[in-house]
Structures are given as C-alpha cells and as structure tokens.
Amino acid sequence: IDREKADIQYPIFVKEELVLNYKGEEIDGVAFDVDLQKELKKDIKLQSLPLFISEVDGKKQYIIPLRGKGLWGPIWGFISLEDDLNKVFGAVFDHKSETPGLGAEINQPFFEDPFSGKSIFEGEELKSIKVIKGGAGEDNMYGVDGISGGTITSDGVTDMLLERLTMYLPYFNKIKPTIEVNSVFSSMDSV
C-alpha cells in the first residue's frame, strides 16, 4: 500500500484494532491512539501495545507498530506478520533525523522490501530479524542487508524489532500456543 494512500486504504484492509497489555490480554483503548513514544517511557508492565489486524485476499496479517532509536533520533515503522505469526508480510520504516544517504535510507524500498518473506521464529524460539552489515545472503531467513554507512541506524532497526516483537509474544502464544513465551514475561507476574 502506497504511503500517500494509507488513510484511504486503512478502513478497507484493517478489520480489527486491539490494545494489549504485557500479558497479551486485550484492554480498553483505541490502537490508533496509542503513542509509542510515551508508552516506551513506561515500565513494561504498564505499557499499552497497539495491534492492527488486516485482511488481504481472505488472509489475516498482524501489524505491529515499532519505535526505536537511530543514530540521531527516533526511528519507527510497522511490521506485518502473516497469519502463521512467523512469516513477514511486509515492513515499513521511517525516521526524523537520520543521515541523508546513509541511515535515512531505512524508508526506501530497497531496504524495506527484503523483509517480506523472512521469518521471525526458528521453531518456537523468537529470532526476530537482524539487519546485517555486509549482507545477509538470500538463504538467511532471519536477516536482511544493512545500509552501507548506516550501521548505528541498522542496529537500531534490529534492536527495535526484537524489543517490540518480544512484547507481543504473550499475545502470540494465546492465539498460537506453540510459541515460546520469553521467560521475562512469565517471571513478571511474581514481581
């Protein structure tokens, strides 16, 4: 979907909006109104996690908003998972102040497109997707090529993906119980 047409396409494709807590439980709220910048400043147990569920050609995609840190400021985006919660349907990224021609390239198709078809799980373990300096190779299901000269921004994308995907593991486990939930979350209930 073209960025410029997102507001028109949104109601056509997005069928459900959820707000989750750290346990993967639905809570009150409007996903579109969740401000990740503010949420990330909160304790993990207090964060609201927005989730959008779209449908394309009769198949669901789970869209997770992302926010992290680049070299000069915030980076953000969305990653969309297919209904198996493993294969990436697509990813988009953006920034406010990354270096033109270097880290600023995260919002270009040559960087975003290779995420499609990658996997975030190896078996039941979350691997996420790593942005790899020097190239990932076509057979690497958990990596994409980094941006030459944009190492810190690339590392920021890697960290952002892992951190945000980890937050959604409890929800993933509720709808697909074979997914291993990181021990960080199971130990939180005892705190």
Regions found by a protein language model. Give the residues of each.
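Flexible, solvent-exposed loop/hinge segments and secondary-structure transition points
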Residues: 1-191
